[in-house]
């Protein structure tokens, strides 16, 4: 098997193992990969892969600390349009809530603030991956929601 094909198989197996959310140590991941036929895998390589794919330790349903991949649709690249950073847009009677890729909320909020009151935006509050935005006078929350959907080419 070609080296790149073998590497792709390793990455696929690695991600599948992390999705199981049952491995609490790098050694356990090494052992599981070796059982699948990846004989040249070691703790150092697993550590680099965990870092490369942004794996984190979190509690699973059994309250055990395990490695898993973050719930992110994709890591943005330099050629990604900003709209790819917006994952979901919803609203209630008071605010429009925008969910973004981790770390992208402040960038998107800055863009919305720059559009300002002319587009119906009174202001925004951004965390790491969530934005609250409220409509300016003369605009309803639904108007603002629809304007933001259109801005990011989202479906109703």
UniProtKB/Swiss-Prot annotation:
Subunit composition and interactions: Homohexamer.
One GO term of the biological process aspect: L-arginine biosynthetic process
InterPro entries xrefs: Arg_repress, Arg_repress_C, Arg_repress_C_sf, Arg_repress_DNA-bd, WH-like_DNA-bd_sf, WH_DNA-bd_sf
Mutation effect (residue 44 to F): Defective binding to ARG box
Main location: cytoplasm
Family classification: Belongs to the ArgR family.
Pathway: Amino-acid biosynthesis; L-arginine biosynthesis [regulation]
Organism listed in the record: Escherichia coli (strain K12)
Protein name (database record): Arginine repressor
Coiled-coil regions listed: none
